[in-house]
UniProtKB/Swiss-Prot annotation:
Protein species of origin: Rickettsia rickettsii (strain Sheila Smith)
Gene Ontology cellular-component annotations: cytoplasm; small ribosomal subunit
GO BP terms, alphabetized: ribosomal small subunit assembly; translation
Protein name: Small ribosomal subunit protein uS19
Record HAMAP family: Ribosomal_uS19
Role played: Protein S19 forms a complex with S13 that binds strongly to the 16S ribosomal RNA.
Signal peptide: none
GO molecular function: rRNA binding; structural constituent of ribosome
Classification lineage: Bacteria, Pseudomonadati, Pseudomonadota, Alphaproteobacteria, Rickettsiales
The gene coding this protein: rpsS
């Protein structure tokens, strides 16, 4: 079920503070975060976030198409190594 519109998008408060601080200073640093649950806001466009995937931090550079989605959607947590090979021996 989707989040109620009257509640608005969820974003951790410290993320907004970090983005505003970087906007004021004019620096383009990578913002390190564990908050995969935060929604991407329009003020995040142009910034690069390091999103934790449970093992390491994945760099995610935000563009306009990402607005409204979650940060965690762009840092996959599982790696697919392919399906197992067929172990049956084929006879001629």
């Amino acid at each position: 079920m989707a989040r109620s519109i009257w509640k608005g998008p969820f974003v951790d408060g410290y993320l907004i503070k970090k983005v505003q601080k970087l906007m004021e200073s004019g620096k383009s640093e990578m913002i390190k975060t564990w908050s995969r649950r935060s929604t991407i806001l329009p003020i995040f466009v142009g910034f690069t976030f390091s999103v934790h995937n449970g093992n390491k931090f994945i760099p995610v550079s935000v563009n306009e198409e990402m607005v409204g989605r979650k940060l965690g959607e762009f840092a996959p947590t599982r790696t697919f190594h392919g399906h197992g090979a067929d172990k049956k021996i084929k006879r001629k």
